Amino acid sequence: MHHLRHVVLAAALLLGFGSCQKSGSGSEGDYTKLTGEVFTTTFSIQYNAQKDYSEAVDSTFHAFSHSLNPFDSTSLISAINRNESQLMDSMLREVFLQSVVISRHTGGSYDVTCAPLINLWGFGFEKKKTDSVTPEAIDSVRAFVGFDKIHLDGMRMIKEDPRMKMDFSSISKGYCSDLVARMLKRRGVTSYLVELGGEIAFEGTNSRGENWVIGVDKPIADPAGVINDFQVRVQLPRAAGGLATSGNYRNFKVVNGKKIAHTIDPHTGYPIQTDVLSATIIAPTCMLADGLATACMTRTAADVPALIQNFPGVEYMLILGDEKTGFRTVMSPGFERLVLPD
């Protein structure tokens, strides 16, 4: 097994709420669709009830942001990062515990305490000038990175080093989709599709009584090297679950004329790129799918099956770089059975 490393993906969860917009489902059944913008991304929520739950959706977004949004200076995670508090709420605690499970099963290749390194490279919630990254700065930050340096005492989060900071962006967007799904289920909804910035929580069927079908981006490079997205159609299971995608083939910065990927390896402190360019995960929850998609970006394709075996009910699709064709796809047998023909 390759040496395992702590890594986290940077993602933007800027505080910025937009109101829900309701659209009816016409003659296709008693379904409601809510759309809008939140956290500088879009959301789309469909469910089998002719009731407007937009206020409950907005309340869920606000509660999530107050707990886990590192861009919100009033959030709990911001206060903990500034050492102004040690107190968590149930949401922050749940996400942290799930992140620790993934960290342990990956041998530390997934780690939410990598925030200072992510910030150093300009991908995190503290904007930095990436041309100022030096070996000395990287070494100093690496000294206080590590999920095993965080301890819980009830609802208190205790850091071994006060310089430690956490960023749950690599898992919390999926968790937010789960929170909306939970809210709908508490109100009697049995079929829903909650999509937040590409992270999806799902259950049941659509308004035609069929399994939900979604599109997953598959990059294709033309002869000139231009990347075009092709949609792989995936028929989701009827049982509750989540789908999430992480990838590097579009998210990068240019530093001194070089493309820098947004996955940082704190073992070295520098960006990492394996042969995995994108990972799509289907899992029992969207939070788990989100975190595992991130973790897959730190591994070679050959290492991913062993990682996924630790998590029952998880399937994957990987986009790999290929010198001849530009990209190629690798899927688990379970994922492949869900892909619809072109």
Task: Please provide the spans of the model-predicted regions.
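Mature catalytic core of soluble alpha/beta enzymes
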Residues: 2-6, 17-342
